[in-house]
UniProtKB/Swiss-Prot annotation:
EC numbers on record: 2.7.1.35
Organism the protein comes from: Leifsonia xyli subsp. xyli (strain CTCB07)
SUPFAM superfamilies linked to this entry: Ribokinase-like
Pathway where it operates: Cofactor metabolism; pyridoxal 5'-phosphate salvage; pyridoxal 5'-phosphate from pyridoxal: step 1/1
Keyword hit for Transcription: no
Gene: pdxY
Protein's recorded name: Pyridoxal kinase PdxY
Single GO BP term: pyridoxal 5'-phosphate salvage
Reaction(s) this enzyme catalyzes, per UniProt: pyridoxal + ATP = pyridoxal 5'-phosphate + ADP + H(+)
Amino acid sequence: MKILSIQSAVAYGHVGNSAAVFPLQRIGVEVLPVYTVNFSNHTGYGAWRGPLIAPDEVREVITGIEERRVLGSIDAVLSGYQGSEGIGDVIVDAVARVKAADPHAVYACDPVMGNAASGCFVAPAIPDLLRDRVVPVADLITPNQFELGYLTGSTPDTLESTLASVEAARAMGPSTVLVTSVERPDRPEGTIEMLAVDDTGAWIVQTPRLPMKANGSGDVTAALFTAHYVRTGEAETALRKTVSSVYDLLASTLESGERELRLVESQEFYANPREQFAVSRVG
């Protein structure tokens, strides 16, 4: 399997491609990483150095890949945080090129905008760009509950309303939706859930909620779910494997006391997920 991953990169730490590439490689995926920024570290530190890559330069890299005549062998395109409107246009164009070479290729979009605690933290033009131009060409999206609400103009705060919001998102274009953080009032205290929906049904999985903030965990989640889903075609299987790997990665990081994900040290959790959490069908 080959995945073209168009995301940010950092020298220190693990976000964007610096979070997604190694777990994908560890489960046997050939990754073609294209960088949209090249920073010293992620912006959560409050200070960083390094360049934003101009959209035209990102496009040039993709054109160079196209000239190697490999776009027809790409199984999926993966994108995450989009720092500018121009990058969004480049990604949409890249998806069109890949699908022209292989109509069966999947575009997986992590529509990064913010979260319930922090609100929207991207440039003002990005949410509308994602909703109106990027998500409609995606086959798979991986929003959190907050992002799902923005995309669909809804308030998903129960299982029923979250499922309804997912169906509204699917009506926009993507057939498969992974909601990476579902919080509802009737869930047991100290837990959090993930929900996956495709044309065959809806599945939810519940895990303990770990007391931590982990930059890059959403990037790992989107990458692993995309690979497992493209490989198996089964949302239930992809959900079960992904949540196991990501939970164990986060638990290992929490135990270490380190701020950055223990991405390399946790590699066995990607290659051989324990699948310790039960997945339930809810639709």
